[in-house]
């Protein structure tokens, strides 16, 4: 593939999404969603009618076939306007669609994937805990089998969207503590079940994504059929959580950062031509011109790394190093891009009358999501066999 030439169907998808964004996601509405911390499910449902949630679902389950280039392009385009709508898309197409396609049992695929393709099934992630971040294998949330049911007890932290999703895709300890990596399972837990307490956390940015929450499970019962992989998946959750799904999550975050950074550059570029000081637009000043040239260049580098990752994902190859490199470089660079664009706007980049301050708030989380930058550096060094 020529990485410098986007496939025609992806370019057509971009045009469709941009028309949708202009019509259904105008800036004033998006700003209000942000202020109200509101997830507009009606707009999300309209988005799903475009067929974009089918991009991660195999044809035999009602989808259009796995297409990561198109999926990543969808995330990027949506993030140029609304991280909330983009998050809803990720909850459906990626958290549900990609994971179910990769590691679910045949019965689970037949049951759930057609719903994903139609945009009717959203997953939250229940992975992190109050004392568990990067060391996922040390989770303490416990699952005990009781006949045809599983009883769940414990607490998950940084669970995005449980107020709007249908299931929490939850990793639990189902075996003896000593059997690290062989005592974990993944279960699907409906957030509405008795015994579940959802406590929203106040965050700086990422508003309108259904909330970032603590979720506590107190003797919550689910049917055993909700264990991902069925009988074979019990105590085999580690192999599923470290499958290619987590690698792909890295470029999902890269695409989010790329979309936000692109919006920031576009706004700063336009502002520099409209803002008049000393009788001329500020884009005539060399210092501003250099800042804009720099962010444009960095943005292009981010784009290339993001879509290289998407292309590798479409080749169905293990690309852990490349995915970590993309996530590390793109999120850190995109953060620098947005902060530079904020400086171009001066005080206007700090007030809610302009979108720039929202870009800053949303971007600050990107180097943390999907594994922090420090973790990505560890992954890269370890995978490249750098001696410890």
Label every model-predicted segment.
Residues 87-107, 133-136:
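N-terminal glycine-rich flavin-associated loop
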Residues 2-8, 12-13, 80, 198-300, ...:
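Glycine-rich beta->alpha junctions and the first turn(s) of the following alpha-helix
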Residues 149, 153-201:
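A short core secondary-structure module
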Residues 1-90, 110-111, 115-118, 384-388:
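Amphipathic, small/basic residue-rich leader segments at the start of a protein or domain
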Residues 141-144:
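A structural signal for short hydrophobic beta-strand segments in well-ordered beta-sheet cores
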Residues 119-127:
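A short, Trp-centered hydrophobic/proline-enriched beta-strand micro-motif
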Residues 2-3, 73-74, 95, 241-247, ...:
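Glycine-rich phosphate/cofactor-binding loops in nucleotide/flavin-utilizing enzymes
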Residues 28-35, 269, 273-283, 296-329, ...:
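C-terminal helix-coil-helix/basic helical segment that borders enzyme active sites and/or dimer interfaces
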């Amino acid at each position: 593939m020529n990485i410098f030439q986007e496939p025609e169907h992806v370019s057509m998808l971009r045009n469709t999404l941009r028309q949708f964004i202009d019509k259904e996601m105008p800036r004033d509405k998006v700003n209000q969603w942000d202020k109200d911390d509101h997830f507009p499910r009606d707009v999300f449902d309209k988005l799903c009618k475009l067929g974009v949630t089918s991009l991660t679902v195999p044809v035999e389950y009602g989808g259009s076939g796995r297409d990561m280039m198109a999926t990543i392009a969808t995330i990027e385009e949506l993030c140029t306007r609304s991280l909330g709508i983009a998050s809803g898309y990720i909850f459906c197409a990626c958290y549900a669609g990609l994971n179910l396609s990769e590691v679910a049992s045949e019965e689970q695929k037949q049951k759930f994937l057609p719903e994903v393709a139609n945009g009717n099934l959203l997953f939250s992630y229940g992975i992190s805990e109050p004392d568990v971040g990067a060391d996922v294998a040390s989770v303490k949330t416990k699952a005990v089998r009781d006949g045809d049911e599983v009883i769940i007890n414990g607490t998950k932290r940084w669970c995005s969207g449980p107020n709007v999703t249908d299931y929490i895709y939850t990793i639990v300890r189902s075996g003896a503590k000593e059997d690290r990596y062989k005592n974990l399972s993944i279960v699907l837990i409906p957030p509405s079940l008795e015994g579940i307490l959802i406590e929203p956390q106040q965050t700086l940015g990422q508003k309108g994504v259904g909330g970032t929450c603590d979720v506590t499970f107190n003797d919550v019962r689910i049917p055993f059929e909700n264990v991902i992989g069925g009988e074979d998946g019990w105590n085999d959750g580690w192999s599923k959580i470290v499958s290619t799904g987590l690698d792909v999550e890295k470029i999902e975050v890269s695409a989010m950062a790329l979309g936000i950074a692109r919006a920031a550059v576009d706004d700063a570029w336009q502002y520099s031509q409209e803002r008049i000081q000393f009788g001329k637009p500020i884009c005539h000043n060399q210092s501003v011109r250099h800042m804009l040239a720099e962010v444009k260049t960095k943005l292009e580098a981010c784009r290339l790394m993001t879509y290289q990752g998407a292309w590798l994902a479409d080749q169905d190859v293990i690309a852990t190093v490349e995915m970590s490199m993309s996530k590390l470089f793109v999120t850190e660079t995109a953060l620098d891009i947005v902060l530079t664009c904020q400086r171009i706007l001066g005080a206007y980049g700090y007030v809610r009358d302009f979108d720039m301050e929202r870009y800053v708030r949303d971007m600050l989380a990107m180097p943390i999501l999907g594994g922090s930058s420090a973790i990505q550096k560890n992954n890269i060094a370890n995978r490249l066999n750098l001696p410890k």
